[in-house]
């Protein structure tokens, strides 16, 4: 049974959660990336398909996708423009609402794969201060800086298995 759902704003500009389930009896993987693109409650995009393929290969029954920023953009430059025009995100209601969804998904996930890519070097503040089971945090590969987790559409082998993050300032900057 394939289940698809998403939590998207009424204006359709922000996505807070994306879920794909193919086996409810198996565990779930959360992928945390930079920002959502076109996937929604019905349609998958390339990133979603890649995450599904990784999770199936690892024996999981579903994925959740959350993002550091909730703004839906196909290109990094569109996100940068939104960030520049938006101002202080840490006081923005969409950002705060998004972080509350991320917190919930992190706690529900059996495995968390950090995968936001090189457009956001280092680690976001909400992960540094969160009260999470840190053993859940993993990555596929790190970017050339040795700190930032690569995005699933990066130049990655399809045979990768998640590696555990050592969440501290020495690893994440």
Q: Which residues fall in each region the model found?
A:
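Hydrophobic/aromatic beta-strand patches that form the interior of the parallel beta-sheet core
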Residues: 30-32, 64-66, 113, 138-140
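Active-site and ligand/interface coordination hotspots across diverse enzymes
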Residues: 1-45, 57, 166, 171-173
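Short connector loops at secondary-structure junctions
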Residues: 61-79
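Amphipathic coiled-coil/heptad-repeat helices and related helical stalk/stem segments
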Residues: 14, 47-48, 95-98
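Glycine/proline-rich loop-helix segments at beta-alpha junctions forming the active-site rim
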Residues: 79-173
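Short, well-ordered beta-to-alpha junction loops that form the rim of enzyme active sites
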Residues: 33-34, 68, 116-119
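Short catalytic helix/loop segments, enriched in acidic residues and glycine
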Residues: 48-56
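Acidic, metal-coordinating catalytic cores used for nucleic-acid/nucleotide bond scission
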Residues: 38-40, 70-72, 119-123
